[in-house]
């Protein structure tokens, strides 16, 4: 992995690439301590371009990527194997826009769920996805797993709250559809293919979500 690290280091700042065992450990263990990852490198991009650059390098080096959000899952979905790179979205955590007229909020994948709820509340709106782990889970993980939560019977799963999505695809391409239209009949609804795919079809980087 040393050659991979050498190629990634110029693309990220000094907090963007973790290789020390002590620094990596929190990204390798899930909450129940039932599964333990084996990766030797964690990349922490802070922009969509950095995510794309990491994916491009991993394609070139034939390295598998394990996207990781808040690492709050209980089934080992974000745990890496030896030789894989953990890509943490925790630094990609900006709220890009709140559109009160359209009742939407556009957020990056690393936004913690409770921060989205609070931002909606400050705008006198409501975001219905609510989970026990909302203080530490990230919206990218909620989308990748199509999380439910306590309001699922009234408002539906997380996929029901999504109007637009942005993601980096396995070939390094950018999928960008953050228009936020509530009625959009233009072709395939590709964002719904990415939601619930747990990172297997792309790395979600941002989403436009419904507010109420």
Predicted feature locations:
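Soluble FAD-dependent oxygen oxidases
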Residues: 38-65, 141, 149, 173
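FAD-binding subdomain of flavoenzyme oxidoreductases
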Residues: 94-212
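N-terminal flexible segment immediately upstream of the FAD-binding catalytic core
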Residues: 1-56, 73-103, 132
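Ser/Thr-glycine-rich phosphate-binding loops at phosphate-binding pockets of nucleotides
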Residues: 69-72, 112
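A common structural junction motif
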Residues: 12, 60-63, 124
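Feature of Fe-S/electron-transfer and energy-metabolism proteins
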Residues: 23-26, 43-44, 49, 57-60, ...
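A short, small-residue-rich loop immediately preceding and capping a beta-strand
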Residues: 65-70, 126
């Amino acid at each position: 992995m040393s050659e991979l690290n050498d190629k990634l280091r110029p693309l990220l700042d000094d907090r963007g690439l973790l290789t020390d065992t002590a620094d990596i450990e929190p990204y390798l263990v899930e909450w129940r301590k039932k599964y333990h990852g084996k990766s030797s490198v964690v990349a922490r991009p802070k922009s969509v371009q950095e995510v794309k650059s990491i994916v491009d390098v991993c394609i070139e080096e034939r390295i598998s990527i394990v996207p990781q959000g808040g690492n709050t899952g209980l089934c080992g979905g974000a745990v890496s194997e030896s030789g894989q790179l953990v890509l943490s979205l925790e630094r990609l955590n900006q709220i890009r826009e709140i559109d009160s007229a359209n009742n939407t909020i556009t957020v990056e994948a690393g936004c913690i769920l409770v921060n989205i709820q609070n931002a909606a509340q400050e705008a006198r709106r409501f975001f219905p996805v609510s989970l026990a782990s909302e203080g530490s889970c990230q919206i990218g993980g909620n989308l990748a797993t199509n999380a439910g939560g306590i309001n699922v019977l009234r408002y539906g799963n997380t996929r029901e709250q999504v109007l637009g999505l942005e993601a980096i695809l396995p070939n390094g391409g950018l999928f960008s559809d953050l228009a936020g239209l509530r009625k959009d009949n233009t072709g395939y609804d590709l964002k719904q293919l990415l939601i619930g795919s747990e990172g297997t079809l792309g790395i979600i980087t941002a989403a436009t979500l419904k507010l109420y």
